[in-house]
């Protein structure tokens, strides 16, 4: 592993052993602490990322999508992924966006998002959609700043919470 300067923040593709587990665990721990979710959050993230990695192995090449991690001082502190949007052919779906609080405010969230959007453009997607839940104000601000617009908002029971599930879309 290359040495990094103190405070060094990077984004790279999640291809190292432990990357997926770390990002899934971060989702489980941080969402439980910050929003009160249960263990199904971590399981949902782990299952989706595992499905992506296994599909990439079957299909070869770029497969159905990619996953990136954010690192701070060489430690994984977040991640984001882009997959084909099953519900909207010709579009991508942004998934698993998260940053540890110690890494927030350093531009890493924007870098993860821009990396995923660059991949969507390279795949010639007509747009990108994402699903989120109400109350994730910092994430929603980041998405809106990138041009995403709220298109669906509905009550839902997700991850042990009564919440509002939201879909946001960005035309490319």
Regions found by a protein language model. Name each.
Residues 1-8:
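Acyl-donor-binding surface of acyltransferase catalytic domains
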Residues 3, 16-19, 126-172:
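C-terminal "cap" of GNAT-fold acetyltransferases
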Residues 9, 13-102, 110-115, 119, ...:
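Acetyl-CoA-dependent GNAT
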Residues 89, 107, 138:
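Residues that form or flank phosphate/diphosphate-binding pockets in enzymes
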Residues 100-106, 134-135:
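Active-site acidic-Proline motif in GNAT/NAT acetyltransferases
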């Amino acid at each position: 592993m290359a040495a990094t300067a103190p405070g060094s923040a990077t984004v790279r593709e999640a291809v190292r052993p432990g990357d997926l587990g770390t990002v899934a665990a971060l989702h489980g721990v941080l969402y439980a602490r910050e929003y009160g979710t249960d263990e199904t959050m971590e399981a949902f993230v782990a299952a989706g990322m595992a499905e992506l990695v296994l599909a990439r192995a079957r299909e070869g090449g770029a497969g159905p999508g990619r996953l990136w991690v954010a690192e701070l001082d060489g430690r994984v502190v977040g991640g984001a992924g882009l997959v084909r949007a099953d519900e909207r052919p010709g579009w991508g779906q942004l998934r698993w966006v998260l940053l540890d609080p110690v890494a927030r405010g350093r531009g890493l969230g924007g870098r993860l998002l821009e990396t995923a959007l660059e991949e969507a453009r390279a795949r010639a997607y007509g747009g990108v959609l994402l699903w989120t839940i109400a109350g994730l104000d910092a994430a929603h601000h980041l998405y809106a700043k990138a041009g995403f617009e709220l298109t669906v908002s509905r009550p839902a029971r997700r991850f042990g919470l009564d919440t509002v599930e939201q879909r946001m879309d960005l035309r490319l």
